[in-house]
């Protein structure tokens, strides 16, 4: 099993408790389905209640399992077209190669990335290269795992300026029901998170972040409680007195409803609170 996480997935359990089950200030619909020929369709639409702006996207995915190939096409209402071709676990177990391209017909702008990642039980590493003739940017990351401990490094190098534009470190520990994650970004941004699965129904998370040279410390607490196999409640609060509440209900297999609200605790009577509504449909 190649289960070492990527750098971006470090601390993911804590992030999920804070982010999943909420959709403040918008009405959102997600639809996923699969054709008889094996083509996967995914579409989503958002309407923001404060601005009235609406957006949407469509994604199709087709897998050729015998050759380890996956073809993905994307389109959104900004008229941006994306194509992704990936080859996984064929040249070597745990190796994934990807070509990701973007085309904007209105402006003729084209861009792309070459991606490579390699995962094993005790490490994972990867690199992305922008396809830009003026000077590509090279991204790289690596994560080492040993007896539950995780250490990661992430960087980006701007070849046009010949300097590092990103320099991040992370250290964490992962167990079955507990995760600890700390990180330092560019030597100026510091953060950490703790995830605890109390039991089969309750998950909790704590998040802390601050920036060097600033007194602005960000702190938050979040929890998720499963009432039953169909219903869950979510709540979170931060040091800015913003309170988030979420309710998720599986109405029937493949149909999920999410209600959420963001309350400004400092200005409770002044209004400005946000609500959200979401539907997820899968067939």
Swiss-Prot record:
Sites where N6-acetyllysine occurs are at 12, 15, 20, 90, 266
What family is this protein classified in? Belongs to the eukaryotic mitochondrial porin family.
Which GO MF terms are attached to this record? nucleotide binding; porin activity; voltage-gated monoatomic anion channel activity
Question: Where does the record place it?
Answer: Mitochondrion outer membrane; Membrane
Please report the organism this UniProt entry assigns to the protein.
Answer: Oryctolagus cuniculus
- Tell me how this protein assembles: Interacts with ARMC12 in a TBC1D21-dependent manner. Interacts with MISFA.
Q: Give the modified residues of type Phosphoserine.
A: 241
Q: Which residues bind NAD(+)?
A: 242-244, 260-264
Give cross-link positions for Glycyl lysine isopeptide (Lys-Gly) (interchain with G-Cter in ubiquitin).
53, 109-110, 266
Listed under catalytic activity are: chloride(in) = chloride(out); K(+)(in) = K(+)(out)
The protein, known as: Non-selective voltage-gated ion channel VDAC3
The alphabetical list of record keywords is: Acetylation, Ion transport, Isopeptide bond, Membrane, Mitochondrion, Mitochondrion outer membrane, NAD, Nucleotide-binding, Phosphoprotein, Porin, Transmembrane, Transmembrane beta strand, Transport, Ubl conjugation
The text the record gives for the protein's domains is:
Consists mainly of a membrane-spanning beta-barrel formed by 19 beta-strands.
Known Gene3D superfamilies for this protein?
Porin
Q: Which GO terms describe its cellular component?
A: membrane; mitochondrial outer membrane; pore complex
The portions of this protein that span the membrane are 26-35, 39-47, 54-64, 69-76, 80-89, 95-104, 111-120, 123-130, 137-145, 150-158, 163-175, 178-185, 189-198, 202-211, 218-227, 231-238, 242-251, 254-263, 273-282
Question: Which sequence positions carry the modification called N-acetylcysteine?
Answer: 2
Task: List the Pfam families hit by this protein, alphabetically.
Answer: Porin_3
Which function does this protein serve? Answer: Non-selective voltage-gated ion channel that mediates the transport of anions and cations through the mitochondrion outer membrane and plasma membrane. Forms a high-conducting channel with a stable open state and a voltage-induced closure with a mild preference for anions over cations. Involved in male fertility and sperm mitochondrial sheath formation.
Q: Which residues carry this modification: Phosphothreonine?
A: 4
Q: What biological-process GO terms show up in the record?
A: sperm mitochondrial sheath assembly; spermatogenesis
Q: Specify the superkingdom.
A: Eukaryota
Classification via PROSITE patterns: EUKARYOTIC_PORIN
* UniProt keyword RNA-binding present: no
């Amino acid at each position: 099993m190649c289960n070492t996480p990527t750098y971006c997935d470090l601390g993911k359990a804590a992030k999920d408790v804070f982010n999943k089950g909420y959709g403040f200030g918008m009405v959102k619909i997600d639809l996923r389905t699969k054709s008889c020929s094996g083509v996967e369709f995914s579409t989503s639409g958002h309407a923001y209640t404060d601005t009235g702006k609406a957006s949407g996207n469509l994604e199709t995915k087709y897998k050729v399992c015998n050759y380890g190939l996956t073809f993905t096409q994307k389109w959104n209402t900004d008229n941006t077209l994306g194509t992704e071709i990936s080859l996984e676990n064929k040249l070597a177990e745990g190796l994934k190669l990807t070509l990701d391209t973007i085309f904007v017909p209105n402006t003729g702008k084209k861009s792309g990335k070459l991606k490579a990642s390699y995962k094993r039980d005790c490490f994972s590493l990867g690199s992305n290269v922008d396809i830009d003739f003026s000077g590509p940017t090279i991204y790289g990351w690596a994560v080492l795992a040993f007896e539950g401990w995780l250490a990661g490094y992430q960087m980006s190098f701007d070849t046009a300026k010949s300097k590092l534009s990103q320099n991040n470190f992370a250290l964490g520990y992962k167990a079955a029901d507990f995760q600890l994650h700390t990180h330092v970004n560019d030597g100026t941004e510091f953060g950490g998170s703790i995830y605890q699965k109390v039991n089969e129904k309750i998950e909790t998370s704590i998040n802390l972040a601050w920036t060097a040279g600033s007194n602005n410390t960000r702190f938050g607490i979040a929890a998720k409680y499963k009432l039953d196999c169909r219903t869950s409640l979510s709540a979170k609060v931060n040091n800015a007195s913003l309170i988030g509440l979420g309710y998720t209900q599986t109405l029937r297999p493949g149909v999920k409803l999410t209600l959420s609200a963001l309350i400004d605790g400092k200005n409770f009577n002044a209004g400005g609170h946000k609500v959200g509504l979401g539907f997820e449909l899968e067939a």
